[in-house]
Amino acid sequence: MTTNTEKYILALDLGTTGNRAILFNSQGASVAQAYKELSQYYPHPGWLEHNAEEIWEDTYAMIKDVFRDTGVSSSNVEAIGLTVQRETCLLWDKTTGKPLHKAIVWQDRRTASLCQELAAKGEAEKIKTRTGLVLDAYFSATKLSWLLDWVKEEKPNLDLKNVLAGTIDTWVLWKLTGGKVHATDHSNASRTMLMNIESLNWDQELLDLFQIPREMMPQIQPSFSIFGKSEPDLLGGSIPIAAVLGDQQAALFAHGCNFPGMSKCTYGTGSFLIANTGNHVTKSQNQLLSTIAWTQLVKGKLQATYALEGAMFTTGACIQWLRDGIKLIDSVAETENLALQVEDTNGVYFVPALSGLGAPHWDMDARGAILGITGGVQRENIIRAVLESIAFQVKEVVDAVNKDSGIPMSHLKVDGGVSQNNFLMQYQANLLGIPVERPAFIDATAQGAAFAAGLTIGLWNNYQKLLSNNKVGQVFEPNKNATKVQESFVVWQKAVSRAKNWIN
């Protein structure tokens, strides 16, 4: 029997609708992967929860599956890169290792009223100045506050000194290291609405505002650093966890967007357009978020790379709703052909505000809507309208980025599961009037985490050489339909105005 001497990097990509483990070889190529769909819990309208135990159990099972399928052991794996859905958070008991409540997901709207109370007290501007974020239920702070109130009421005898808080990266790190490491990185911490974007530390005034004890919060580390090692008994050996990133930041890194002005858009559960703004915070005048792309130690000094982001909450989620909610389709993949069976939407416009509206509207009270229905409208028209709405949202954010930067975007790099829809990508190119570039390997999130971990550990020492292995899969150029598509955008904006402020 021959011994496998190849060296690998393991990427863990823990998303909103599913979790994935991908093994990359020493050339930076994907050689194996495992995937598990994640259960979604909707206890009340506008609420969404995940079972953190399921996330951990799936993570562990996927690692085992990848090792079994490839014959690779922990001794072959140089490092683990971890990337996660952001903002989703939980509390757990460090004594038992059990979550105290299901994790509250980033799409969850239960704390909208708390945000409105804080806005009425004039706290929104302070929060934006300190964190770069708008005051919204999207971020972790109000979710952690709600969870703490629930624990105090439902478990009054629990000693809060035993309670730990964290986003999904923190939870999985804690489990991977056998409870030895309670940490996060700056890219994930910057999405909690509790980290000061200038000092790069927890902001005590904001912790006090949301009544969250600092000792519950994880230590913040550079994104590209050694967070600890996996517990030997778990994986048959200790593997360094050498990078932790938010999912959108990991995708930005995979695309090679390491210079100011470079950007990408991920089409996943939501759509997220991020533009690198360099080593200084750029404040948006157009309702974009100022956030951390990643951090690293350079000659012993902490260096932050900042970004502007437009977060759109509902992309794959509205296609999933077509399948699971109203059962108009049997599979996500068939939406492309169904949309192409009709010339247009027959006057139908869809507003994808199933979890409110994100950038650039930031309307927690908006709700989804289908407008323009007449007797001649068919299933295919509605499906096409849903896909078109995804492109319309992205155009709003691209327009905002262009205004903030003063430099029109020349092309758009894309990734994520929904970017496989050729109809949508062509429609997006027509709408923006610029080429849309999709890589051959679309799991950019996992790839970015792998690249970061391999560079941190020294398996690779040339980022640009790694990127040169990335092949362009397809470029969608604007075609003769561009003018008609852009006219539809104006009508869609009218539909959005009808759906805004719906429940207030």
Curated annotation (Swiss-Prot):
Protein name per Swiss-Prot or TrEMBL: Glycerol kinase
InterPro entries attached to this UniProt entry: ATPase_NBD, Carb_kinase_FGGY, Carb_kinase_FGGY_CS, FGGY_C, FGGY_N, Glycerol_kin
UniProt family annotation: Belongs to the FGGY kinase family.
One function term, GO molecular function aspect: ATP binding
Annotated binding of ATP, by residue: 16-17, 269, 316, 320, 417
An example Gene Ontology biological process: glycerol metabolic process
Stated regulation of activity: Inhibited by fructose 1,6-bisphosphate (FBP).
